[in-house]
């Protein structure tokens, strides 16, 4: 055996066979795409186009896009940005946006500290309201008070445990209705 055959037997890779037309398969520049413009676009999209360095690119170099700011304008813009930053920091620290509070956050602590005072039971009356509207509102208040007194009296009179006789037939009816529905649905 020759040395070459021994290497193949040991499991080493064979050298790649070169094709004569290999340059044709890998060359994008030789593709026939029509005119030169389409060819350049294709090469640019495929990333195979030749890079042409046109010189140093400076952002804002074009006269139509560049404008010069005065020192006063720069100061004004930086003040506005700083003010916006402070507002966002204050709002995030004050608790207005509590979406991302992290571990250990408890809503109950903050609500006890910053709970707004309860609204007054009777709002102050406006001078522009007529006396008839005041009379109507006072009648509604007295009616609502009497209704709430009747409800509390009715609650006290109701028995705490329902009668077993009343609840038992209802549960049996519910079971029989369920069975009948099941029988009807499977039978048809």
Curated annotation (Swiss-Prot):
Disulfide cysteine pairs (residue numbers): none
Comp. bias (Polar residues): 83-95
Any Pfam family matching the protein: SMAP
UniProt-annotated stretches for the region Disordered: 1-188
InterPro entries documented for this protein: SMAP, SMAP_dom
Biased composition regions of type Basic and acidic residues, renumbered to the chain: 49-82, 153-176
Biased composition (Acidic residues): 130-152
Family: Belongs to the SMAP family.
Record's protein name: Small acidic protein
Gene: smap
